[in-house]
Amino acid sequence: VAPVYPARALSRGLEGFVDLSFTVTTAGTVKDPIVLQSTSSLFERAAVRAVLKFKYKPRVVDGVPVEVPGVKTRISFMLED
């Protein structure tokens, strides 16, 4: 799921990234996203919204799906030439 480029960042020609940490649930959805680092606060809300739409295959231990905390990802915001 691609994030929506924030209008203020777009109008200013800003590029950047947001590093996030979150938990993957037993259903493969994302919960509790936390911003670890970002180049601009303008990107944080868009990155959190995008990561909440991510879907994962749940981790299975002994035939039972388990939550996976501490998953990390970087969402990049780059302007096209």
PLM features: residue spans?
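Short glycine/proline-centered loop/turn elements that form peptide/ligand docking sites
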Residues: 20, 30, 35-44
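Short secondary-structure transition/capping segments
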Residues: 29-30, 49
